[in-house]
């Protein structure tokens, strides 16, 4: 039967759009028929969906070459999933863009590299992944044609910078030191099962783990929302700054803040008066220093590269005055998360890179902007966060318990408080779960609370003080919102070498 000819990218795209609504079951059956007619072997694993579309739908043999899938049309086909969760539309995984050939890649010129040759013109077919639904029932829902040279100029520069950074590692004989965390949009993702396999690429240099070019999951999420849903306008973290090939984005972030190190918060508030008093005050000052119109975490670069901003105020011993919080979690959604690396906690706490801006007091007792750093959780601590995630899921599954205790409010009046059985700070010394809301709420659903699918067990005191005997007792139907936190003592150890004396 042989390959069907596609001379133009328009032909390929038209055929791709005709696949919308056809189930994977149909595609796999067509693929199997094509393979039988052409004496081809069926491929198993993550790539089999792409192979099934190429062979079954496009009648075109899958290739592993360093050139586009459709040579004459000069276009590379990708089939990738998105999902919908409490945070909206998200890419389910990174987009693999082919094996990194340490030995044979043209590391001297980006536009002549194997990466560029194969991926400069992409046709991306998106399907929705739904947990619990058989894969055979999925179908392509959206098709996007992406030319790298037509992406926003800032995206182009960052992608090229990432590629050139990979090239520098390889040419210096340091391919074995490559890490996804050091790249913004285009990363050298681990390829294969994640074992100890290593490849030799030069007799002089250490062997390196096999890797593939990949667009990060955070980049694909933002790309999907911008191009497929057109839900949001683009704003930049550094709108007035020209990104330079020889400078890291991380370095530019820190250099922009440097002139303000040692300045008092009061003087910064006078210079940057558009701030909200209270919790967001320091974040707003930092945003204005960067001349960003939006909150930094809503900007293009921060979302595509999965950066987070956190301002940390430390005491005289260098300990942050508060733990480091993340978004309140959905109890039912957390329980449905079976895969750790696809969880919201992993995305927010492990897969994120943090711009930490430190505030302290100077010798006069004035609060100042002390320093800033780029940080991500050390690999040795990742499993400790995973343990907290697993324990939180276990608590929800086995039953939340609310233990009644006695305390005093600010006026000194005796009150009831309720302690839950989620993992506390002594569980891992790295992360924990506790209330997210400013005020506790156990009697109704409002901005501070959630309604539980399975009511909590309320354990009351054996003896109730006389003045509290008429106080209502929760039914367990409602509970104060909860979130994951990095412990402040843990964060003290992470930032201790960056705190300056003023």
Each model region followed by its residue ranges:
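Nucleic-acid endonuclease domains
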Residues: 1-71, 76-502
């Amino acid at each position: 039967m042989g390959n069907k000819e596609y001379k133009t990218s328009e032909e390929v795209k038209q055929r791709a759009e005709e696949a919308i609504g056809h189930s994977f079951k149909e595609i796999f059956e067509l693929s199997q028929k094509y393979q039988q007619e052409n004496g081809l072997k069926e491929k198993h694993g993550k790539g089999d969906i792409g192979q099934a579309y190429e062979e079954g739908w496009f009648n075109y043999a899958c290739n592993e070459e360093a050139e586009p899938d459709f040579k004459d049309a000069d276009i590379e086909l990708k089939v990738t999933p998105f999902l919908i969760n409490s945070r909206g539309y998200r890419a389910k995984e990174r987009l693999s863009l082919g094996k990194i050939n340490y030995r044979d890649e043209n590391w001297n010129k980006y536009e002549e590299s194997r990466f560029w040759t194969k991926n400069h013109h992409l046709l991306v077919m998106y399907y929705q992944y739904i947990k619990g639904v058989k894969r055979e029932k999925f179908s392509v829902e959206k098709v996007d044609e992406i030319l790298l040279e037509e992406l926003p100029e800032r995206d182009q520069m960052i992608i090229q910078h990432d590629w050139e950074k990979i090239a520098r590692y390889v040419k210096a004989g340091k391919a074995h030191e490559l890490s996804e965390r050091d790249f913004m949009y285009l990363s050298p993702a681990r390829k294969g099962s994640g074992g100890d396999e290593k490849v030799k690429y030069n007799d002089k240099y250490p062997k390196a783990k096999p890797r593939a070019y990949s667009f990060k999951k955070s980049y694909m999420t933002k790309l999907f929302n911008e191009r497929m849903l057109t839900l949001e306008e683009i704003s930049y973290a550094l709108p007035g700054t020209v990104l330079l090939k020889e400078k890291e984005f991380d370095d530019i972030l820190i250099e922009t803040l440097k002139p303000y190190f040692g300045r008092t918060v009061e003087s910064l508030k006078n210079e940057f008066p558009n701030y909200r008093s209270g919790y967001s005050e320091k974040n707003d000052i930092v945003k204005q220093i960067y001349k960003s119109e939006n909150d930094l975490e809503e900007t293009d670069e921060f979302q595509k590269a999965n950066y987070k901003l956190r301002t940390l105020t430390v005491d005289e011993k260098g300990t942050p005055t508060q733990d480091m919080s993340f978004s309140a979690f959905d109890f039912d959604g957390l329980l449905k998360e079976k895969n750790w690396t696809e969880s919201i906690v992993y995305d927010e706490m492990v897969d994120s890179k943090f711009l930490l801006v430190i505030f302290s007091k100077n010798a006069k007792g004035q609060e100042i902007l002390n320093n800033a750093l780029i940080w991500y959780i050390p690999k040795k601590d990742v499993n400790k966060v995973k343990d907290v995630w697993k324990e939180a899921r276990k608590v929800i599954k086995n039953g939340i318990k609310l233990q009644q205790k006695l305390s005093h409010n600010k006026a000194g009046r005796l009150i009831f408080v309720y302690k839950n059985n989620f993992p506390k700070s002594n569980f891992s010394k790295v992360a924990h779960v506790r209330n997210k809301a400013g005020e506790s709420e156990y009697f109704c659903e409002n901005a501070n609370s959630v309604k539980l699918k399975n009511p909590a067990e309320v354990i009351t005191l054996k003896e109730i003080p006389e003045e509290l005997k008429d106080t209502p007792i929760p039914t367990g139907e409602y509970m104060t919102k909860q979130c994951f936190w990095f412990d402040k003592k843990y964060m003290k150890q992470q930032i201790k070498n960056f705190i300056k004396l003023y």
